[in-house]
């Protein structure tokens, strides 16, 4: 399994209380305020993948040694670019996710973010400092 596959294999689900739109999807401006200068900890199969989002549209991620070995990927860290398009967080890693761009709708409850990717995959993350 490649690193990108582990990132998406989390199998996490949105809360049963409603759809992402009902739970208050973030606007483009809200997305920027939520992630710029922050580390977002993506929850993956019992681990957290920290992703840092810089104001210049760059991002970087680093898996723990254990998570990277479980992923059997070709690297435990990667970088890429992010942008906001149509009130979605879009990102493209250099190697992870096969270097393909993906966009996500996000909703936030406190420090928890629920996301839905354009292909329907879902998951959660937490916002750090």
Where are these regions (language model features)?
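Bacterial N-terminal signal peptides
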Residues: 5-15
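Bacterial Sec-dependent N-terminal signal peptides
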Residues: 1-3
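Lipid interaction determinants
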Residues: 17-79, 85-129
């Amino acid at each position: 399994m490649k690193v990108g596959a582990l990132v998406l294999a989390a199998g996490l689900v949105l809360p049963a209380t409603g759809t992402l739109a009902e739970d208050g999807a973030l606007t483009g401006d809200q997305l920027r305020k939520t992630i710029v200068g922050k580390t977002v900890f993506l929850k993956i199969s019992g681990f957290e993948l920290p992703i840092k989002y810089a104001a210049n549209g760059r991002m970087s991620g680093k898996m723990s040694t254990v998570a990277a070995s479980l992923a059997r990927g070709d690297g435990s860290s990667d970088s890429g670019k992010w942008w906001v398009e149509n009130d979605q967080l879009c990102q493209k890693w250099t190697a992870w996710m096969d270097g393909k761009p993906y966009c996500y709708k996000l909703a936030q409850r406190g420090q928890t973010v629920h996301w839905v990717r354009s292909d329907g995959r879902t998951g959660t993350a937490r916002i750090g400092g």
